[in-house]
From Swiss-Prot:
Binding sites annotated in the UniProt record for diphosphate: 43-44, 165
Presence of keyword Glycosyltransferase: yes
Source organism of this protein record: Salmonella typhimurium (strain LT2 / SGSC1412 / ATCC 700720)
GO molecular function: guanine phosphoribosyltransferase activity; hypoxanthine phosphoribosyltransferase activity; magnesium ion binding; nucleotide binding
Protein known as: Hypoxanthine phosphoribosyltransferase
A GO cellular component annotation in the UniProt record: cytosol
UniProt keyword terms in alphabetical order: Cytoplasm, Glycosyltransferase, Magnesium, Metal-binding, Nucleotide-binding, Purine salvage, Transferase
A Pfam cross-reference name: Pribosyltran
Binding-site residues for IMP, renumbered to this chain: 99, 103-108, 131
Active site positions: 103 (proton acceptor)
Gene: hpt
Length: 178
């Protein structure tokens, strides 16, 4: 399928928003008194996670999960599979799930449910991109970088069939007439 990628959110805007999210997260957790863990959902969140953890100014651990509901195309499936679980115990800790993009909410709802059973002190969600118009499951999201329209986006860690993760901006995929 022939397509092009148009810049939707430039790199400078992303960096500025992540700095602001870091300040908000720091403010929320600075007096918690508990250990904090940022849980990045791979693969898409890795760039966001790396930049965000440098902006969060409270001591924190970093861990990762891989949960998948996407195939190699442009649509989501309803099946959610945990492909890689956390390496560390989160019991009694403040846990912040870091996601690249929330679409239907199915994946995040399942991850939140699984992590909630592990008895964290608190459980919150931070996403770079949110598509509220696509939501099928109500998931509380405490920290949102950008709310975006229902466009297929790539870049800044987000892929299309494993391509475009390297882009320093978020772009929308525009299909071309063949």
């Amino acid at each position: 399928m022939k397509h092009t990628v148009e810049v939707m959110i430039p790199e400078a805007e992303i960096k500025a928003r992540i700095a602001e999210l870091g300040r908000q997260i720091t403010e929320r957790y600075k007096d918690s008194g508990s250990e904090m863990v940022l849980v990045g959902l791979l693969r898409g969140s890795f760039m966001f996670m790396a930049d965000l953890c440098r902006e969060v100014q409270v001591p924190h651990e970093v861990d990762f999960m891989t949960a998948s509901s996407y195939g190699s195309g442009m649509s989501t499936t309803r099946d959610v599979k945990i492909l890689k679980d956390l390496d560390e115990d989160i019991r009694g800790k403040d846990v912040l799930i870091v996601e690249d993009i929330i679409d239907s909410g199915n994946t995040l709802s399942k991850v939140r449910e699984i992590l909630g059973l592990r008895e964290p002190k608190s459980l919150a969600i931070c996403t770079l991109l949110d598509k509220p118009s696509r939501r099928e499951v109500d998931v509380p999201v405490e920290f949102v970088g950008f709310s975006i329209p229902d466009e297929f986006v790539v870049g800044y860690g987000i892929d299309y069939a494993q391509r475009y993760r390297h882009l320093p901006y978020v772009g929308k995929v525009v299909l071309l007439d063949e």
